[in-house]
Swiss-Prot record:
Signal peptide: none
Protein name per its UniProtKB record: Tetraacyldisaccharide 4'-kinase
One Gene Ontology MF term: ATP binding
Pathway in which the depicted protein is active: Glycolipid biosynthesis; lipid IV(A) biosynthesis; lipid IV(A) from (3R)-3-hydroxytetradecanoyl-[acyl-carrier-protein] and UDP-N-acetyl-alpha-D-glucosamine: step 6/6
Gene Ontology BP term (one): lipid A biosynthetic process
EC number: 2.7.1.130
Origin species: Pseudomonas putida (strain ATCC 700007 / DSM 6899 / JCM 31910 / BCRC 17059 / LMG 24140 / F1)
Its job: Transfers the gamma-phosphate of ATP to the 4'-position of a tetraacyldisaccharide 1-phosphate intermediate (termed DS-1-P) to form tetraacyldisaccharide 1,4'-bis-phosphate (lipid IVA).
Keyword vocabulary terms for this entry: ATP-binding, Kinase, Lipid A biosynthesis, Lipid biosynthesis, Lipid metabolism, Nucleotide-binding, Transferase
SUPFAM superfamilies in alphabetical order: P-loop containing nucleoside triphosphate hydrolases (SSF52540)
InterPro entries recorded: LpxK (IPR003758), P-loop_NTPase (IPR027417)
Length: 333
C-alpha cells in the first residue's frame, strides 16, 4: 500500500500516531481560516460572474461521488430549459494552454479524466483552469449561458459563488475530524454550517444535517466499443478484475459485491494513469473499471474490458429544494 493510501486509511480509522501531526494541523488551519476571512472581508478580490455560479465540492480528501452528482445537476438544469456550463481545475491535465475548452475527442492527459467524462456524457461546454474565475470568464466569452457549475473549487474563493453544495461520504463521514495533515479535512468541520446544502453519498434517506443520495449502477459499457449491456451480462458469482483509480476505491468494490459478482480488487491512486501492461492481470478474467478510469483506457482496451455506468439518485426532498434555489437564483430583478 502506498504512503498516501496508508495515510488516508489512518485518517478515517483514527490512528493515534496522527497526534504527532497536530502542530502542522494547527498551522494549516490558521492559514486556510485567514485566507477565507480575507475574502469575506473584501481584503482579497473575488470575481462575481453575471450568471449564477453553483459550486459542487467537498471539505474532505477522498472520493464523495462528485462527478455523478455534477452529471445529475447538468441534466436536471437542462430539463428546466437552462443552458449550463461547467468549469473545473482539470486535475492532472496537461492542456496546450489555459484556460482550455475540453472537447469529447481530446486525450485524457490533455483534458483531465473527470472533465473529459463530463463532456463525453453530456456535451456540456466545459473549461479547465486552476484559476476558476478565469475559466468562468473564458466560458462566458465563448457562448451565452444561464448558469455555471463549478466542479470542486470549494476552497477557491477568488470565484464568488451563489450556491454551495458540499458532498460527504456517508460511510466515512469526516474521518477523525482533523484538518490536514492530521486528518482528511481541507477546512474545519464548522465550515459545513456555511454551505447551502450538504449531501451524503450512500444515504438513501435525508438526515438532519443534510440530504441523501445514492449512486445507482445502470449498465455495463464496453470500454473499447461503447456497447451497453444490462447488468445481468455477468451471472451471479462471476469472478472479475476490478480496477478503481478514484478517491475511494473500496466503495466501487463494494458496489460490485452488491451486484453479486466476485471482484479481484486492484486499487490505484486517484487520477492514476494506466497502460495495457499495468492492467495485465492473472488469471485472465473480465475486467470492470469505473467510468472515470475508462476514458483513459479506450486506446488500448481489450475486448472484455467494461466500465460500470452509475447514476446519482438524490432524494425527492433535495430535488424540490434545488428547484426552489434555481427559481431564486434566476429570478429577474
Amino acid at each position: 500500500m502506498a504512503f498516501a493510501d496508508r495515510l488516508l486509511a489512518a485518517w478515517y480509522a483514527g490512528h493515534p500516531a496522527l497526534a504527532l501531526l497536530r502542530p502542522l494541523e494547527a498551522l494549516y488551519r490558521r492559514v486556510v481560516t485567514r485566507k477565507r476571512a480575507r475574502f469575506l472581508r473584501g481584503d482579497s478580490a473575488s470575481y462575481r460572474a453575471p450568471v449564477p455560479v453553483i459550486v459542487v465540492g467537498n471539505i474532505t480528501v477522498g472520493g464523495t461521488g462528485k462527478t455523478p452528482m455534477i452529471l445529475w445537476l447538468i441534466e436536471h438544469c437542462r430539463q428546466q430549459g437552462l443552458k449550463v456550463g461547467v468549469v473545473s481545475r482539470g486535475y492532472g491535465a496537461r492542456p496546450p494552454r489555459l484556460p482550455w475548452r475540453v472537447q469529447a475527442d481530446q486525450p485524457a492527459d490533455e483534458a483531465g479524466d473527470e472533465p473529459l467524462l463530463i463532456v463525453q456524457r453530456t456535451g456540456v461546454p466545459l473549461m479547465i483552469d486552476p484559476d476558476r474565475a478565469r475559466a468562468v470568464q473564458a466560458l462566458l466569452a465563448s457562448e451565452p449561458l444561464d448558469l455555471i457549475l463549478c466542479d470542486d473549487g470549494m476552497q477557491h474563493y477568488r470565484l464568488a459563488r451563489d450556491l454551495e453544495l458540499v458532498l460527504i461520504d456517508a460511510a466515512r463521514g469526516l474521518g477523525n475530524g482533523r484538518c490536514l495533515p492530521a486528518g482528511p479535512l481541507r477546512e474545519p468541520a464548522d465550515r459545513l454550517r456555511e454551505a447551502d446544502a450538504v449531501l451524503f453519498n450512500g444515504a438513501s434517506e435525508d438526515r438532519t444535517e443534510g440530504f441523501g443520495f445514492r449512486l445507482q449502477p445502470s449498465a455495463l459499457v464496453n470500454v473499447r466499443t461503447g456497447e451497453r449491456r444490462a447488468l445481468d451480462h455477468f451471472p451471479a458469482g462471476q469472478r472479475l478484475h476490478a480496477v478503481a483509480g478514484i478517491g475511494n476505491p473500496q466503495r466501487f468494490f463494494n458496489t460490485l459485491l452488491g451486484l453479486n459478482w466476485q471482484p479481484v480488487p486492484h486499487p490505484f491512486a486517484d487520477h492514476a494513469q494506466f497502460s495495457a501492461r499495468s492492467l495485465a492481470f492473472s488469471p485472465p478474467l473480465p475486467l470492470v473499471m469505473t467510468e472515470k478510469d475508462a476514458v483513459k483506457c479506450r486506446a488500448f482496451a481489450a475486448d472484455d474490458w467494461w466500465y460500470l455506468a452509475v447514476e446519482a439518485q438524490p432524494t425527492p426532498a433535495f430535488s424540490a429544494w434545488f428547484d426552489n434555489q434555481l427559481q431564486r437564483l434566476l429570478r429577474k430583478p
